[in-house]
Amino acid sequence: MKLSRRSFMKANAVAAAAAAAGLSVPGVARAVVGQQEAIKWDKAPCRFCGTGCGVLVGTQQGRVVACQGDPDAPVNRGLNCIKGYFLPKIMYGKDRLTQPLLRMKNGKYDKEGEFTPITWDQAFDVMEEKFKTALKEKGPESIGMFGSGQWTIWEGYAASKLFKAGFRSNNIDPNARHCMASAVVGFMRTFGMDEPMGCYDDIEQADAFVLWGANMAEMHPILWSRITNRRLSNQDVTVAVLSTYQHRSFELADNGIIFTPQSDLVILNYIANYIIQNNAINQDFFSKHVNLRKGATDIGYGLRPTHPLEKAAKNPGSDASEPMSFEDYKAFVAEYTLEKTAEMTGVPKDQLEQLAQLYADPNKKVISYWTMGFNQHTRGVWANNLVYNLHLLTGKISQPGCGPFSLTGQPSACGTAREVGTFAHRLPADMVVTNEKHRDICEKKWNIPSGTIPAKIGLHAVAQDRALKDGKLNVYWTMCTNNMQAGPNINEERMPGWRDPRNFIIVSDPYPTVSALAADLILPTAMWVEKEGAYGNAERRTQFWRQQVQAPGEAKSDLWQLVQFSRRFKTEEVWPEELLAKKPELRGKTLYEVLYATPEVSKFPVSELAEDQLNDESRELGFYLQKGLFEEYAWFGRGHGHDLAPFDDYHKARGLRWPVVNGKETQWRYSEGNDPYVKAGEGYKFYGKPDGKAVIFALPFEPAAEAPDEEYDLWLSTGRVLEHWHTGSMTRRVPELHRAFPEAVLFIHPLDAKARDLRRGDKVKVVSRRGEVISIVETRGRNRPPQGLVYMPFFDAAQLVNKLTLDATDPLSKETDFKKCAVKLEKV
């Protein structure tokens, strides 16, 4: 599309706004103005975090050459963060993979062989043999897949169908297990439905923002720019930031709180106690819309059953709860006094009181934001439940400017991992594999025999590592993720299984990541606008984009790989006779015919695409594959509070927030006048629960799985930095971003460094009970840990910080705690 005068003016306004917000607009975006006639522009959501910013992608001669913030995108309003402006360069790293690579020796596959180029047919030949052998000898539980919150919606849906229906294996899990699983379980326990009830529009209407374990200044910078604008434009607006170390978000904080790791649970219960003691409960809301329950305690740490902590737990993995009275709940939180909380957390009393007053003040509209500080936590589900308690006690929920809001880290952790249901226990639209009715709904819609989908929950991310190591999981396909770098406890629990001769590991990726180089077969993958896609962001906004360029060489999309590989299997090879007898018409058919080339999926002709519109998969297959998969998937949520709009609407819009009913999106769920599922006169209805009421849980403080001691005397917290995203497999290939932050460092308090005879710039060995890495001492800069804690980002493949981390998880969500383990330092 051409740049109109209006668009040109908007682009200049964007540049001015970006400068005012401290956001960089690099030359690649500025230089496009003089080239408009030669560049074709189209919309897309950003490839990086879960904010879901809209961008305009400029293509020229088959390449992405420019990118700018989309002034018509309601999320970012024309702004991009530094990563977003460099999107054109993420696809053009010098080491981009362009053909399949198999470990070979003497002309055939060998686990210890060298990576050798092969054809796609050869790659699928080897995969077919490995899958069929495992299925025949050990059954569906011997194969698995690790997917991604970066999959497009239809890629995740196709993968889930292939494994849960085709291969009859629930051993499929996304990397969102490592970042959003605690949020999912927290939502389900409290509300009976997943995902936030509010939206980003809350920012411009809130009186107070409370960040719990969220460095939004670096991890969600566009949303942070909106919060900054709200705070600096209104003197009565307050910002509170809670963390175990000081970071850039503290620069805006009116109340910056540093607490002892794990003690956020104490603070949350203290605030609930403060609300009750100060008669700040919204009695009308509370009496009509809330139930009280006491949760099981001493639930363990998600470690192997043989671990001493698991043996000592009284209720390992228990999600049980029982009703309780208000008086009992009042007595429960009464134990969390101001004095006790200050002592356990290390937070001054006046700061705790100021924080509690924000929630207790009936005239303050409060938003609570959190990300990995809450979720990557051995009691992450509890932390989610406890922050909901504060909003339910005060009625500050499901209304403009008020509410709890779990922010996501990946572009489609919501839209794909959660909504599609690519977790080992989930199906589309909040359905689960353990529910016979839910399985039946899916089997009927997919026209497969009753009983095809297993009722047993599959292996979650950490359990997959353990099963590979134990030789129980033998064929493993990972897509769109770099778990050898990103997952916990690399040395003890992941690398042994990947390099075990009993196992065959496939990695689909655009680049030779740490994971790819540890695999047996690497499949080159198309990325971002090299394929047609859809993401769902943190505010329930589903966004589409068109394919705008073609992938290099033989690189193919994850969707193409899944669909084409399904052709290699006939139903007789994957389903037992008792299933085939129920639908004999499926005998002799391939999984491609049963799952993808069905009348339901293939009914949309390629002619619906514009004549010059790229869509490699659909043009090869002869039908509009993405539309067919999306419309089939969307059926599950329509009429059930997860309504998605018709496929074509999304290509016209800058995203729509579900539920979309009668063409209208929903900004605030569960409240009358905002949510189409709440009838007139109901006020609020949390319709995920049978009685329409949300749940307040009584849950105590319980300690971390590992804490500093005399030998390992420091806490280690891991995370990200502004310039890089996750493991850096894309951002480190952008020269400007790499130069801005070329290698990971160890952020440490100056006094802790001095006590160990360390100075800024020194090399230091960081050692845990599981491994060691060499890093660089940093006593200044953006992150300032308190004494007793160090912080390391995980983007650097040369410093695999996850050699150090413990594979302890929240026992309910199975999400790893990357924020708390014990280390010691040795000068190099």
Curated annotation (Swiss-Prot):
Chain sites annotated for binding [4Fe-4S] cluster: C46, C49, C53, C81
What are the 4Fe-4S Mo/W bis-MGD-type domain coordinates in residue numbering?
Answer: 39-95
Q: Which HAMAP family match?
A: Nitrate_reduct_NapA
Q: What is its main location?
A: periplasm
Record's NCBIfam families?
Answer: NAPA, PRK13532.1, TAT_signal_seq
Q: Name the positions where substrate binds.
A: F794
Q: Name one GO cellular component term.
A: nitrate reductase complex
Q: Which reaction does it catalyse?
A: 2 Fe(II)-[cytochrome] + nitrate + 2 H(+) = 2 Fe(III)-[cytochrome] + nitrite + H2O
Which taxonomic lineage does the organism of this UniProt entry have? Answer: Bacteria, Pseudomonadati, Pseudomonadota, Gammaproteobacteria, Enterobacterales
A Pfam family name for this chain? Molybdopterin
| Organism per entry | Escherichia coli O157:H7
Q: Write the signal peptide boundaries.
A: 1-31
Q: What does this protein do?
A: Catalytic subunit of the periplasmic nitrate reductase complex NapAB. Receives electrons from NapB and catalyzes the reduction of nitrate to nitrite.
What cofactor is needed?
[4Fe-4S] cluster; Mo-bis(molybdopterin guanine dinucleotide)
EC numbers for this chain: 1.9.6.1
- Describe its assembly: Component of the periplasmic nitrate reductase NapAB complex composed of NapA and NapB.
InterPro entries xrefs:
Asp_de-COase-like_dom_sf, CT_Nitrate-R-NapA-like, MoPterin_dinucl-bd_dom, Mopterin_OxRdtase, Mopterin_OxRdtase_4Fe-4S_dom, MopterinOxRdtase_cofactor_BS, Periplasm_NO3_reductase_lsu, Prok_molybdopt-oxidoreductase
Q: Which residues bind Mo-bis(molybdopterin guanine dinucleotide)?
A: 83, 150, 175, 179, 212-219, 243-247, 262-264, 372, 376, 482, 508-509, 531, 558, 718-727, 802, 819
What this protein is called in its record is Periplasmic nitrate reductase
